[in-house]
Amino acid sequence: MEDFPVLEMVCLGSSVALSGLFYYIYRKKRKTVDKLKEAPVMALDAKLIDLLNATPGKCLQYVVVEGTVQPVGEPLRSQFQESSVGVIQKLVLREHKLVWNSLGRIWTDSERVLLQRVNAVPFNLLGLNKSFVRVLCPLEATGPKMEIVHEKFHQATYGFTDLIGQYLSGEKPKGQLETEEMLKVGASLTVVGELILDTDRLLKIRPPTDGSEYFLSSADFETLLMEQEGQAEVWRVFACICALAGVAVLIWTGRRYYRQLKLRWEQENLRREFEGMGTGEREEDNGVENACVICLSNPRGCVLLDCGHVCCCFRCYQALPQPFCPICRQHIKRVVPLYQA
């Protein structure tokens, strides 16, 4: 029986590792979804302060608050559009280029971030009757998806010598993409986190102290919940696919192992049968005309099928490098003992 192949070990180990990783991510996402489903949606009004005053510790661990963005002081202004103001600003400069793939013999697209800067100012969520809640640590949250207020692509220019250098280096610059994103003043925002009543009598929402995920979303709560459920389902599908691939590799390997083991059993039984009948025949058949054509010492003791030639002893048959008849070179499908009267 052959050793366990390295390729099958790698495939099986990779499928087990990936399925375990994807299942861990799925369980983490599933836990987040379950916490979101349990989180109460709090109306942002004057009654919220009374509720927190009556709550032990003046804290609600995981709640949903919806409102409109309002800066505490001076808002951020767009560097490219004077009319655009917001509370979070993200400037990104990306380089786009073509890279020569020597394996596929093609040019492939590649990009990398040359510069990224995020600015933020304190802001509140404005609710009913001028009630508001201060949003703390917005850059630590997942989201929000901000509006792109500026996007411009700067095309690369180069001369003849640059072209030669590009083909020698295997990199061909395409240009740079400049983008600016902003969370604008007045935008609707959904925040999921820990709500507290601070010592200054201000409502504040912050990242949960129990490690739960902190969300800022431009969509409503129902859309946010559906997005998280969709992400959890994707990871579950990935985990199932990898697990099924591992099971398939295991079944295929086990089947091949069983076939090899069965063949070994058959060969062992056949060897014992030949040994049992060969002791008496060696004394009777010592003629040259009945000698094995390979070793020329043992008598011919097996019939090679399907060709039917009787030309060798069983030991020499087992020693054949490939199962081909020594006489006609036909493939040997099976071998049976030769019984002589």
From Swiss-Prot:
Q: Topology: which residues are Mitochondrial intermembrane? A: 27-233
Enzyme class, broadest EC rank: transferase
Its annotated compartments are: Mitochondrion outer membrane
From what superkingdom does this record's organism come? Eukaryota
Q: What are the TM regions of this chain, as residue ranges?
A: 6-26, 234-254
Chief subcellular location equals: mitochondrion
- Which Enzyme Commission number(s) are on file for it? 2.3.2.27
UniProt-listed Gene3D superfamilies: Zinc/RING finger domain, C3HC4 (zinc finger) (3.30.40.10)
Q: Pfam families from the entry?
A: GIDE, zf-C3HC4_3
ZnF RING-type: positions: 292-329
Instruction: Show the catalytic activity.
Output: S-ubiquitinyl-[E2 ubiquitin-conjugating enzyme]-L-cysteine + [acceptor protein]-L-lysine = [E2 ubiquitin-conjugating enzyme]-L-cysteine + N(6)-ubiquitinyl-[acceptor protein]-L-lysine
What are the coiled-coil residue ranges?
none
- Topological domains annotated Cytoplasmic: 1-5, 255-341
What pathway annotation does it carry?
Protein modification; protein ubiquitination
A GO cellular component annotation in the UniProt record: peroxisome
Q: Name one GO biological process term.
A: positive regulation of canonical NF-kappaB signal transduction
Could you tell me the membrane topology recorded for this protein? Multi-pass membrane protein
Extract the GO molecular function terms from the UniProt entry: identical protein binding; ubiquitin protein ligase activity; ubiquitin-protein transferase activity; zinc ion binding
Keywords attached to this entry: Membrane, Metal-binding, Mitochondrion, Mitochondrion outer membrane, Transferase, Transmembrane, Transmembrane helix, Ubl conjugation pathway, Zinc, Zinc-finger
Comment block on domains: The zinc finger domain is required for E3 ligase activity.
PANTHER family xref list: MITOCHONDRIAL UBIQUITIN LIGASE ACTIVATOR OF NFKB 1, RING-TYPE E3 UBIQUITIN TRANSFERASE
| Assembly behavior | Homooligomer.
Name of the molecule in the record: Mitochondrial ubiquitin ligase activator of nfkb 1-A
* Organism annotation: Danio rerio (Zebrafish)
* Encoding gene, per UniProt annotation: mul1a
